[in-house]
């Protein structure tokens, strides 16, 4: 007899079964509490499962002891659910009825389907590997049972079963497909093959002689459910609280003044793509996009043609040519690009034009009167090649008939074909023709025409050409060309001095007007012809413009830490000054000049006791002090002022002057001069500085950034006095017969001359001989008649001086003298050039002479609610919070951004104060408490980012993350930052910022020329526009911003605690997933890993659902599929399915 060899694992299993049988026979205790596989070291749980199933389903009956024990082992996880299914599928038996009975175990195992561990994604593959074989096994078993209908009936008779044998596998199959987790897992397998197997089962049922309608219906339902579960689930996000207000959106309208007035150098393609991206993010329809573009463009023109309340035209920037150029040149190109790139259809554009023609009729009327042109008809002429005559003719007819019914518009009804001469449109078209010379290589011809505009005083034509150059992106090229001409004329050459002076003067005036009238143009890029540096930065024009073209300061002055560093900086500045003087041929002794400016005064020997302060009263002061009508405050303001030069110096405070005039008789006013001449004024003893503070000599001013980076040459004060005396006689101070004359030395005299003129007006402010001062200034103008650019420089220098009474007085003198000079010099050679200069500096003169517009002292809310005021901002002013609030209310009430209000934001951006205005506007938004206002306000803030898109996007994103998504933000709940309605609006802004950041990054990566990473960047600051590597640096910064955001999300979520911050992250992810399908969303979704959704499901399963996970998973990415399976299992673990 042959012996059977049994391996050790089988022996252990047999031992386990024997013990189980014995315990069952003795019935002493519950079997489940007595026997467990863990008590049998080395046992194979899969082999144990196989044997338990054989004993449980052996023959024609079911052994409940073994069956129940098996199920209990599954419950306490001694045996896994997939081992049971594996045993059922692979256990061999010659009785098909027994196999059908075993299917009830599969049905039971459906509730236990779960991943083995969440620590390893590979366990997800194990889960998938058993799904498809199980369905195939059940489907095949049903087909085998139904294959022989006679045998089916015999089985039912033999075993005395009331139900058909196929019901057990069919119920198991139904449980498998109806279970949310199992049916979702089946979708990851070959769905078509599973569908095919189910269809075969249905066909088998249909072939029965005695059809089973209930079974057939059940199979059909299973097919439908499986197909439905295999379809991708769409995520729908409805932000509670603000969804009803997502109707009126000002974003596109606000983009128009930004592109027209502040980013007019951008290409039409970029403008169109940005507008389309905003439209996609905001879920705008095509006709609404066209309507809002036209609305914004026509609003811009209407505002430019009127005076704003408390904001006259002489105190505000002129956007006349920017608005005109945008409407007539850029706007048709933008619409054409949207059509040709298939962003919009012709039908959508037609519908938008019809809506604009109906709703904006009155605004077009006002614009046509201002432009003296049929603006809408001219626009249709430009769009006719892409729209076709069948669309444009009916619109043209409607507009023309309307214009003919209005007497005011009748003269302009046919101006789309026959322009009126000398109108803005006529000048603009002429400018376009002249700029075309550059395209044909006729650079010299264009230069001659452009300079002629300066010589003939054609300011409008000049500004029109400048606007076209900026629009077409050729201003930098032209600027560098004229700077090179200016440099060539500045230095000595074979050309005569007078001719060099004329060329230098013409080009200097031309370049200066461009920079003055276009403050958004970078001086560095304008001079260098684009990003990077060149020798042009060594020119006098560059150095002068960097110091005296009044703009918001970009660079902070160096702050020395101690006296040693301060002295080193002063020495460096002195060395740079000597080099600059040597370059232009100035040989003045500046060291003696310093001593001349600040002479040492010996302290008189006064025999008194030790006191902190010594002073001798002024007789005028005594008269005022003894007068009982004078207040204590007035007495405190009267001081004896020490004049180091021994010259009389008047107090510049207005109040004491007024008091003295009213209290002292006229006869007394003449006496102090004789009295003061005989009074010795002692030095006032000053308290010694503290040891820990840096010691600075009083005569040494602070070192500025401009002194270090763009030093100007300088003449001595003694030489300046001689020059000024010569000019007061009407004689130029430079030699026109010196062939080696460097014109830069002439320019270098202006600051000293200006300072002397200011000093003269300071000394005689209250009793200046106005007639004599005007005559002297008029003579000075005659002296520089051949070089009017010096007058421009004098005004620029005075404009940058600190505000004082002397500065204002000198401005009055210059203004009156200029009018007088122009009145008597109408036949002069350079008369028209002087007219051109007067137009250039008129705003400077107005601001120097007149006071800035003042606002009533009331609260922002009451002030702005009562009337719509646009705040004033100086050309170099960094607006404070009060003005920014006024600008916000001004824009908020109109749901549109005036370029004059946007100018405040531009200044704040230039001063790197992004956080200031963004914090104010976000705070005002979330405190409004009205869904309509909050939604519209957030969309306005989003549009403001385009003023300085790259900087603003990063800075406002950092602010939002720091306030709402920092690790400790959840502890700050008392301040209301997580108020339900407010947080919805903040999430909306966060979503918009992330979307536009991703789109901007993609644009930078894919624009021409092809991006090549050259720098190994690890940390970098925001680059300036002049930086040649700015593209690569911005790409690095945007990438870092997005990566840091995702990392912060993971860091917060991995703590495993549900908080307000985690809830905000959940809502943000839902908002991104629910945004409109566009390129920005697709790029951002790819960046967010599905692991983040899985982590959130692990913390709070009810907060996320399967449709959200589908958004962030790529079906072709295996790791994403594994994560999705883990996500489903996490939902099963908490029984929180939401499919």
Curated annotation (Swiss-Prot):
Protein's cellular compartments: Nucleus; Cytoplasm
Effect annotated for changing residue 103 to Y: In sy29; egg-laying defect
One cellular component (GO) term of this entry: cytoplasm
Stretches of the chain forming a coiled coil according to its record: none
Tissues showing expression: Expressed in seam cells and all six vulva precursor cells (VPC). After VPC division, expression is restricted to descendants of the VPC cell lineages P5.p, P6.p and P7.p (at protein level).
Mutation effect (residue 751 to L): In n545; many defects in reproductive organs; egg-laying defect, sterile, protruding vulva, vulvaless and male mating defect
Mutagenesis or variant effect for residue 840 to I: In n1772; temperature-sensitive
GO terms under biological process: cell fate specification; defense response to Gram-positive bacterium; nematode larval development; vulval development
Entry superkingdom: Eukaryota
Record keywords, A-Z: Cytoplasm, Developmental protein, Differentiation, Nucleus
Motif (Nuclear localization signal): 695-701
Annotated function: Participates in the inductive signaling pathway downstream of let-60 Ras and the RAF/MAP kinase cascade to regulate specification and differentiation of many cell types. Positively regulates the fate of vulval precursor cells. Required for induction of the P12 and excretory duct cell fates. In males, it is also required for proper formation of spicules. Does not function in the signaling pathway that promotes exit from pachytene. Plays a role in responses to M.nematophilum-mediated bacterial infection by promoting tail swelling and preventing constipation.
Name under which the protein is recorded: Protein lin-25
Organism of origin: Caenorhabditis elegans
């Amino acid at each position: 007899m042959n012996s059977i060899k049994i391996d050790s694992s089988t022996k252990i299993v047999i031992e386990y079964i024997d013990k189980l049988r014995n315990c069952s026979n003795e019935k002493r205790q519950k079997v489940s509490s007595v026997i467990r596989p863990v008590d049998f070291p080395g046992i194979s749980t899969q082999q144990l499962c196989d044997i338990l199933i054989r004993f449980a389903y052996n023959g024609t009956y079911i052994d409940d002891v073994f069956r129940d024990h098996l199920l209990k082992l599954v419950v306490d996880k001694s045996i896994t659910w997939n081992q049971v299914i594996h045993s059922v599928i692979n256990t061999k038996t010659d009785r098909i009825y027994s196999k059908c009975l075993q299917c009830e175990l599969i049905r039971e195992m459906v509730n236990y389907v779960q991943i083995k561990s969440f620590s390893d994604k590979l366990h997800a593959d194990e889960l998938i590997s058993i799904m498809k074989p199980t369905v195939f096994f059940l489907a095949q078993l049903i087909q085998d049972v139904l294959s022989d209908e006679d045998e089916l009936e015999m089985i039912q008779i033999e075993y005395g079963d009331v139900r058909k044998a196929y019901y057990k596998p069919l119920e198991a199959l139904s449980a498998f497909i109806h279970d949310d987790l199992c049916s979702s897992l089946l979708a990851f397998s070959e769905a078509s093959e599973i569908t095919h197997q189910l269809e075969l089962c249905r066909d088998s049922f249909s072939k029965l002689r005695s059809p089973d309608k209930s079974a057939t219906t059940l199979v059909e339902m299973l097919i439908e459910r499986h197909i439905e579960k295999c379809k991708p689930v769409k995520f729908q996000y409805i932000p509670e609280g603000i969804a009803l207000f997502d109707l009126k959106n000002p974003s596109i309208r606000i983009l128009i003044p930004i592109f027209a007035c502040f980013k007019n150098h951008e290409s039409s393609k970029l403008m169109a793509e940005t507008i389309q991206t905003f439209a996609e993010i905001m879920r705008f329809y095509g006709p609404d996009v066209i309507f809002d573009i036209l609305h914004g463009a026509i609003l811009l023109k209407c505002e430019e043609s009127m005076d704003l309340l408390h904001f006259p035209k002489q105190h505000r920037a002129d956007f006349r040519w920017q608005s005109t150029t945008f409407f007539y040149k850029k706007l048709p190109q933008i619409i054409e690009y949207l059509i040709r790139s298939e962003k919009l259809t012709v039908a959508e554009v037609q519908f938008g034009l019809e809506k604009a023609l109906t709703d904006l009729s009155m605004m077009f009327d006002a614009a046509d009167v201002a432009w003296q042109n049929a603006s809408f008809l001219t626009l249709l002429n430009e769009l006719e090649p892409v729209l076709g005559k069948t669309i444009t003719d009916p619109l043209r007819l409607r507009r023309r008939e309307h214009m003919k019914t209005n007497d005011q518009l009748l003269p302009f009804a046919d101006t789309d074909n026959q322009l009126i001469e000398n109108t803005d449109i006529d000048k603009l078209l002429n400018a376009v023709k002249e700029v075309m010379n550059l395209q044909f290589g006729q650079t010299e011809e264009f230069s001659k025409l452009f300079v002629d505009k300066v010589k003939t005083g054609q300011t409008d034509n000049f500004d029109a050409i400048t606007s076209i150059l900026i629009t077409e992106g050729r201003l930098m090229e032209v600027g560098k060309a004229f700077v090179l001409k200016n440099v060539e004329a500045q230095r000595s050459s074979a050309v005569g001095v007078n001719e060099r002076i004329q060329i230098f003067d013409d080009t200097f005036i031309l370049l200066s007007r461009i920079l003055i009238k276009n403050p958004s143009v970078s001086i560095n890029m304008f001079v260098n012809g684009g990003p990077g540096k060149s020798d042009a930065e060594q020119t006098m024009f560059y150095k002068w413009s960097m110091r005296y073209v009044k703009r918001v300061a970009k660079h902070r002055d160096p702050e020395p830490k101690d006296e040693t560093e301060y002295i080193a900086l002063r020495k460096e500045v002195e060395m740079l000054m000597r080099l600059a003087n040597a370059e232009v041929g100035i040989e003045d002794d500046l060291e003696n000049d310093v001593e001349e400016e600040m002479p040492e005064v010996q302290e008189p020997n006064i025999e008194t006791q030790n006191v902190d302060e010594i002073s001798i009263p002024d007789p005028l002061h005594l008269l005022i002090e003894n007068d009982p009508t004078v207040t204590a405050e007035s007495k405190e303001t009267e001081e004896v002022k020490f004049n180091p030069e021994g010259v009389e110096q008047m107090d510049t405070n207005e109040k004491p002057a007024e008091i003295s005039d009213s209290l002292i008789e006229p006869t007394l006013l003449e006496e102090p001069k004789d009295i003061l001449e005989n009074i010795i004024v002692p030095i006032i003893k000053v308290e010694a500085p503290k040891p820990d503070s840096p010691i600075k000599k009083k005569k040494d001013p602070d070192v500025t950034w401009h002194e270090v980076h763009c030093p100007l040459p300088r003449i001595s004060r003694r030489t300046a006095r001689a020059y000024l005396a010569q000019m007061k006689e009407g004689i130029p101070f430079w030699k026109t017969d010196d062939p080696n004359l460097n014109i830069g030395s002439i320019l270098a005299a202006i600051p000293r001359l200006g300072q002397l003129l200011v000093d003269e007006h300071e000394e005689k402010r209250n009793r200046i001989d106005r007639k004599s001062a005007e005559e002297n200034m008029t003579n000075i103008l005659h002296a520089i008649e051949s070089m009017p650019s010096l007058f421009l420089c004098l005004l620029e220098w005075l404009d940058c001086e600190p505000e004082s009474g002397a500065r204002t007085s000198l401005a009055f003198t210059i203004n009156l003298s200029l009018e007088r000079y122009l009145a008597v010099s109408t036949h002069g050679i350079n008369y028209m050039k002087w007219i051109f200069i007067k137009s250039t500096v008129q705003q400077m003169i107005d601001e120097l002479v007149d006071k800035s517009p003042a606002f009533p002292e009331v609260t922002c809310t009451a002030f702005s609610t009562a009337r719509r005021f646009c705040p004033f901002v100086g050309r170099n002013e960094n607006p404070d919070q009060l003005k920014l609030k006024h600008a916000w209310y001004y824009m908020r009430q109109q749901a549109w951004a005036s370029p004059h209000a946007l100018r405040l934001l531009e200044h704040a951006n230039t001063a790197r104060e992004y956080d200031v205005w963004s914090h104010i506007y976000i705070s005002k938004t979330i405190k409004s408490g009205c869904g309509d206002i909050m939604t519209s306000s957030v969309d306005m803030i989003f549009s403001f980012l385009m003023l300085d898109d790259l900087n603003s996007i990063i800075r406002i994103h950092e602010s939002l993350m720091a306030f709402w998504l920092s690790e400790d933000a959840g502890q700050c709940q008392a301040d209301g930052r997580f108020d339900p309605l407010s947080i919805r609006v903040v999430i909306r802004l966060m979503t918009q910022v992330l979307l536009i950041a991703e789109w901007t990054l993609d644009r930078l990566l894919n624009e021409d020329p092809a991006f090549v990473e050259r720098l190994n960047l690890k940390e970098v600051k925001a680059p300036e526009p002049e930086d040649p590597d700015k593209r690569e640096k911005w790409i690095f910064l945007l990438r870092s911003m997005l990566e840091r955001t995702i990392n912060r999300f993971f860091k917060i979520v991995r703590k495993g605690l549900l908080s307000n911050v985690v809830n905000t992250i959940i809502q943000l992810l839902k908002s991104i997933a629910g945004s409109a399908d566009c390129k920005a969303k697709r790029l951002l979704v790819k960046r967010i890993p599905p692991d983040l959704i899985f982590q959130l499901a692990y913390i709070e399963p009810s907060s996320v659902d399967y449709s959200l996970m589908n958004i962030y998973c790529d079906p072709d990415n295996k790791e994403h599929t594994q994560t999705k399976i883990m996500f489903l299992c996490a939902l099963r673990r908490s029984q929180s399915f939401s499919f």
